From Swiss-Prot:
Cited SMART domains: DHHA2
Organism: Staphylococcus carnosus (strain TM300)
Swiss-Prot/TrEMBL catalytic activity: diphosphate + H2O = 2 phosphate + H(+)
List of residues binding Mn(2+) 2: 15, 75, 97, 149
Protein name (record): Probable manganese-dependent inorganic pyrophosphatase
Binding site for Mn(2+) 1: 9, 13, 75
A molecular-function term among this protein's GO annotations: inorganic diphosphate phosphatase activity
Domain of life from the UniProt record: Bacteria
Disulfide bonds: none
Pfam family, one: DHH
Family statement drawn from the similarity comment of this UniProt entry: Belongs to the PPase class C family.
Annotated localization: Cytoplasm
Amino acid sequence: MESTYIFGHKSPDTDAINSAIIMAEFEKLNGNDSAKAYRLGKVNPETQYALDYFKAEAPELLTEDLTDKDVILVDHNEFQQSADTIESAKIRHVVDHHRIANFHTAAPLYYRAEPLGCTATILYKMFKEQGFEIKPQIASLMLSAIISDSLLFKSPTCTEQDKAAAQALENIAGVDAQEYGLEMLKAGASTVDKSPVEIINADAKTFNMGDYSVRIGQVNTVDVNEILARQAELEQAITETLSGAEYDIFVLVATDILNSDSTILVLGKDKDKIAKAFDVELDNNTAFLPGVVSRKKQIVPPITAALS
């Protein structure tokens, strides 16, 4: 039987990694024994904390050419966020909770997208709909992804369905979501040991917006000043990234996970348009965005509107 490659987006976060593992389990329960989870980048500290805590193995790094291979995408659909050879692959299934853009297939496919806070919540629903048992380890991976994407249920993207799923999964996983979740988020929030390049690329996605290619990186922290203290070296890393890639604008979002606010650092072409998108002015290339924590719901839409 031909292998099925399952993976999330580049610069993977907890939802991208965990949902690939969960989807592979779902496929196997549906009789697809050739399904295997992969990742498109390094496992970040937050995700590694979750994997270690629940004794789960990280997926293998995908290095193969996907031409004519069967693939399933989770937690993304836009080609520029996916594997380099994705346009030559046979995309059989997508499970996602983001906008649909820069995506097409040559053949029909299963596509499930819902405006929920996390891909793992959709997968939870799929397990329930099929009557599949959700084992404790799978439950723990689902719960970790929901906590991550919702910033412990504080993000405006978090829905009642996400909260209900998390409550059910908390019981199966046998952990206290608040206590475990805060420790997991803290594990991924320290930037002291990270290089500037690691910080700007750890959770970065590329978006096509009008005539612009925009790179938006997000870093969670418990102290935004820890990030701003390194502004000069971060700007150098961003400038080098802009000069060496086809990006027009780079937006680094430093999100305070305790106070649910963000500070943006913006460099590139027409950067003032980014400030206008949020009705603020850049001061030394930065601006404070109170109450903004979600890239998907609070950052991408206004920037898209401003640049389109």
